[in-house]
């Protein structure tokens, strides 16, 4: 964990790759047989673009910065790398993975456990909103992989329940989101508490200045891998807008849309928790079945809602951007931005989930006069077109 001067000249927003070797099958990566078995059992057939590029340099021990959106297979990229590098016979934390939200941390834990199914390893999720005592107990058992949110992880390291002496790898997922959520100080503190030799792997959708600073301070001559925007996942997603004259008319517009379209599963995004609750009440009053999720809810509630949504027993989920980061719901065919996102980066996180790995999807944006500028910005930023919604939209979903 040292400095790399080469990063200071990178324009904000995008890194330049300095590594272009690709390995296009898992069999050629020289992985442990138990790990390979887990990868295929999980349903992977061949590596995605980021997996072809990033797994090998991580396994070889390089510090790695990978710039990639959710939906590109990045969780499996670092999960496979971590599992290849840890020693299952050593009951101590050897890899620490940080994520910005509890949901994402739990999802990463599930992937690590599933892919590592034949390896006899433990992976513990160390997240806020759960019992501190349970955390302490689980950490004393020496899980080889710990995945968590910065606050709780920092607390557990300070209290010496999460011991860092055997730590080989530190992974920061969605680094841009973690730093923008105000976790910078805790992340810097965690870096200081890790062994000097710890390998650092950082993943981020965007590369703002605060992320570049972390890479400069704590990474040694990192391999830089950029999965370009056109390789990401707006492809295959039809994007439309509906012009709504006034904010108050969005509700009727949504009700009309419900009448026209048969929805297998949809996510409706609002910008505030209050709006999520308000919209949920209004739709419920109109006899539409919806569930809601945002950061004010406790962990058990959020887990239950996600479970119902994943299993299909709940079909329409109204959420804030909390859900937009990395939560994988396979069968979402429609995303509605009731509010356009407050920043353009979140647009791809919201709608990029509708057509992940080439699955088709439809995104519909409700746009008032105040939103037109933001919509144009989004179009420009992603070099994409958002067209007026056609009358036959039902045929497209």
UniProtKB/Swiss-Prot annotation:
For this protein, what reaction is catalysed?
A: ATP + H2O = ADP + phosphate + H(+)
State any GO CC term. cytoplasmic stress granule
Domain of life the protein comes from? Eukaryota
* GO function term, MF aspect, one: RNA helicase activity
Record GO biological process: cytoplasmic translational initiation
The residues forming the signal peptide are: none
Return the InterPro entries for the record.
Answer: DEAD/DEAH_box_helicase_dom, EIF4A_DEADc, Helicase_ATP-bd, Helicase_C-like, P-loop_NTPase, RNA-helicase_DEAD-box_CS, RNA_helicase_DEAD_Q_motif
Cited SUPFAM superfamilies: P-loop containing nucleoside triphosphate hydrolases
Stated EC number for the protein is: 3.6.4.13
Q: Which UniProt keywords apply?
A: ATP-binding, Cytoplasm, Helicase, Hydrolase, Initiation factor, Nucleotide-binding, Protein biosynthesis, RNA-binding
UniProt keyword Aminoacyl-tRNA synthetase present? no
Gene3D superfamilies reported for this sequence:
P-loop containing nucleotide triphosphate hydrolases
Q: Which Pfam families match?
A: DEAD (PF00270), Helicase_C (PF00271)
Q: Where in the cell is it found?
A: Cytoplasm
Q: Where is this motif: Q motif?
A: 24-52
So where does ATP get bound?
Answer: 68-75
Query: Would I find RNA-binding among this entry's keywords?
Result: yes
**Residue ranges of domain Helicase C-terminal in the record:** 236-397
Q: Which residues form the Helicase ATP-binding domain?
A: 55-225
On assembly, the entry states: Component of the eIF4F complex, which composition varies with external and internal environmental conditions. It is composed of at least eIF4A, eIF4E and eIF4G.
Notes concerning its domains: The Q motif is unique to and characteristic of the DEAD box family of RNA helicases and controls ATP binding and hydrolysis.
The task this protein performs is described as: ATP-dependent RNA helicase which is a subunit of the eIF4F complex involved in cap recognition and is required for mRNA binding to ribosome. In the current model of translation initiation, eIF4A unwinds RNA secondary structures in the 5'-UTR of mRNAs which is necessary to allow efficient binding of the small ribosomal subunit, and subsequent scanning for the initiator codon.
Q: What's the name of the protein?
A: ATP-dependent RNA helicase eIF4A
Organism of provenance = Neurospora crassa (strain ATCC 24698 / 74-OR23-1A / CBS 708.71 / DSM 1257 / FGSC 987)
The organism's taxonomy opens as: Eukaryota, Fungi, Dikarya, Ascomycota, Pezizomycotina
Gene for this chain: tif-1
